[in-house]
Amino acid sequence: MADGKSGGSVATDSIPVTNRDAGMKNFSETVTVTSSSQGPREEYKMDHKRRGLALIFNQENFESLESRPGTQADRDNLEKSLKDLNFEVKIYNDKKKSDVEEKIREAANADHSNADGFVLVFLSHGEKDHLFTYDKKISIKDITSPFKGDKCKSLIGKPKIYILQASRGGIADDPVVSPCGGDEPDTVANKCAIYTLPAGADFIMCYSVAEGYREADGSWYIQALCEMLQKHGTSLEFTNLLTLVNRMVSKRSANCNNKDLKGKKQIPCFASMLTKQLYLKPKK
C-alpha cells in the first residue's frame, strides 16, 4: 500500500485529565459557556462540508525492535471503517521519526475550516508516554500538541480522535473473579501500561492497555473497534461505542499455543476530554 492514501464558567472537561493545573495553559482551546447555553445533550456540529482528515501511521518494521506481524490487517480494517464514515484517510507505513513529524506538521498546518474533526491513528510498539517510529521513539505530546487550539486554529472546538494501538511485548493481565458474581472474570488493567495523556479540550484518546494476541485479522482491540464502527459508527454516541469495544475485548481470552497467555485478559481504555456528545452521523 502506497503512502499518502487517500463567557461564563469553563467546562471542566476542557482541562486535561492528567494535570488540570497545567491544562489552564491551554485556555485558548477551552469552551467557555454560560450555564444556560449548554444542555446535557449538546452535540458537536458535524454538518461541515467534509468529515475530516484521518492519518494512519502503521509501524510494522523497526530498525532495532521486533516486527509487528498482523498490523497490516489492523491498518486495512481501520482504513475501510474510517472511509465508510467519510473520513479522508492517509496511510503512512514504517516511517522514521523525522517523516512522522513532517506529516504531523503538514496536517496541523492544513485548513480544517470545512471539516467536522480530525483523526490520528498510531499502530506501533509503545512505552509509557512514547510510541516508536521506525528508528526512534516519539512522545504522545508531540503528536497531540500541534493540533491544540493555540497551534491549529481551524480545529478549535472540533473533536480530535486519537487511536493508539501500542504493543508492549505480549504482556497480559491475569483475570480475577468478578465481585458482581458473574461468570466472566474482570480484567485488571496493568498500571504500568497507562499512557500519559498530554491532550486538551475536545480530544479523546483511545488506546490499548496491553498487547492482545495477534491473529491473521489483527489485534483484538482494532478488530473490536472496527466491528463497532461498522455496526454503530453512524448511530451511537462515540464514547458509548468505545464502552462496547472495551466490553468486547475484556471478554475475549487468548486462545493460542503460548501457555503464558492462556486465560489472559486484555482491555483497552479511553480518556475523553470531549466537551459535547459526538455522533458521526451520515453525511448528507
Regions found by a protein language model. Give the residues of each.
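Cysteine endopeptidase catalytic domains of the caspase/legumain-like
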Residues: M1-K284
